[in-house]
A protein has these predicted regions:
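Aromatic-rich peripheral "rim/lid" segments of glycoside hydrolase catalytic domains that contact
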Residues: 3, 7-14, 18-31, 35-44, ...
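Conserved, mostly hydrophobic/aromatic
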Residues: 2, 65
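Low-complexity "stalk/linker" and mucin-like segments enriched in Ser/Thr/Pro/Ala/Gly
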Residues: 212-219
């Protein structure tokens, strides 16, 4: 498995989120404009898949590390409790993950993360969990199980956990909380497609539409079964 790492270098090094600017380290030039930045993120992740396929014998590609510094902008969020910038930065990364359809593991979860010392590694503070926030009882959702979690809305998103076929498109509109999945079903697979639908994005519930199949909600997940002979299945989930 090619477990390459990728980071938004400008944000990682400067510890500031600029949604309108990035630095393309391969081309060694700046990327300007919000749309251009997001296109660059997705292209960089697709390049990892292309490299694995064309230069490494077609082995699977896994984005083994990516993430953002939570102590950005002078660690203001630690005193204000406002992680909206971190949410925005994470969402931009996850939008690129969805667009490129690459498998990923975020960096990182550190059980002992503290505001004053970060992850205790290389001066980094990239953990999605903070012990100080946990000890203070801080929960972004009000649920005790979410105590200590940071910028949850940036990375706790709907996604296809298991797909009975080939994903053609997956995206999540963070502002409107609309999730779209389009896939080509493999009718030899008896199991349904399973989509994770997190309550943090749909606190008042959700509605769904399936074209080319039917759905069923169980335990906060949407299970989709393709219709007999369907060539494509389109799923849309929206907030109630």
């Amino acid at each position: 498995v090619d477990a390459s790492h990728w980071y938004d270098d400008l944000t990682l090094v400067t510890k500031k989120w600029r949604g309108w600017m990035a630095f393309d380290s391969r081309a060694e030039k700046p990327v300007l404009g919000p749309k251009a930045v997001r296109r660059y993120f997705a292209r960089a992740m697709r390049d990892i898949k292309t490299w694995s396929r064309e230069r490494m014998g077609g082995i699977p590609a896994l984005l083994g590390e990516y993430g953002i510094p939570f102590d950005m902008n002078g660690a203001r969020a630690y005193s204000s409790g406002d992680y909206s910038l971190q949410e925005e930065a994470l969402a931009a990364n996850y939008d690129a993950v969805d667009e490129s359809l690459i498998d990923t593991t975020i960096w990182n979860y550190t059980a002992g993360n503290r505001h004053d010392r970060g992850d205790l590694w290389n001066g980094e503070d990239l953990s999605i969990f903070c012990r100080d926030d946990y000890d203070s009882g801080r929960s972004e959702t009000g649920d005790p199980l979410d105590r200590g979690g940071r910028a949850l809305r940036g990375f706790v998103r709907p996604y296809a956990m298991a797909t009975a076929g080939e994903i053609l498109e997956m995206r999540f509109d963070t502002r409107r909380a609309v999730f779209t999945l389009r896939y080509r079903p493999d009718h030899a697979i008896a199991a349904p497609t399973e989509i994770y639908v997190p309550e943090v994005q749909y606190p008042t519930g959700f509605s769904y539409e399936v074209q080319g199949g039917e759905g069923e909600v169980k335990r906060g997940r949407l299970f989709v079964t393709a219709g007999l002979g369907a060539g494509e299945v389109l799923v849309r989930i929206s907030r109630d």
